[in-house]
Amino acid sequence: MTSKPLEHVADIEKSLRHIAAIIKQKGREILNQYAITPPQFVGLQWLYELGDMTIGELSGKMYLACSTTTDLIDRMQKNELVERVKDPADRRVVRIHLLPEGERIIQEVITKRQEYLRDMFESFTDEEIAIFEKSLMKLQHEMKRK
């Protein structure tokens, strides 16, 4: 594969950065309707997608120190969004479990974020959306691979 012209890569990087910032801002506006912080949302999102996790596993996914994640979980447990449960296979292991209220909030927030994106795609044809989705998935795959 030949090297892509740097100006195209620079334009794509700039567009992705701007899109990410807009989505992040819109996501925060949506989160302001709920009693959770952006880091709590990220933690809830990982638990929703992957199921019960240890503090260490969640810390790794969130790129946070275990002590920071512990404080985050303490606050979410106090608000009855998550609970700590002993692993039945190894009682020394404690897993973080998403409670119904945490699941409700994460589902509502994700739905509102998806509705926002759907509105942004109103002027796109079905073919453009399919190509865009395929390209994003390919980029994500390459980024995970390297």
From Swiss-Prot:
GO terms for molecular function: DNA binding; DNA-binding transcription factor activity. Keywords: DNA-binding, Transcription, Transcription regulation. The keyword Nucleus does not apply. SUPFAM superfamilies: Winged helix' DNA-binding domain. The keyword Transcription applies. InterPro entries: HTH_MarR-typ, WH-like_DNA-bd_sf, WH_DNA-bd_sf. Residues 55-78 bind DNA. This is Uncharacterized HTH-type transcriptional regulator YsmB. Residues 9-141 form the HTH marR-type domain. GO terms for biological process: regulation of DNA-templated transcription; response to stress. It holds the Pfam family MarR.
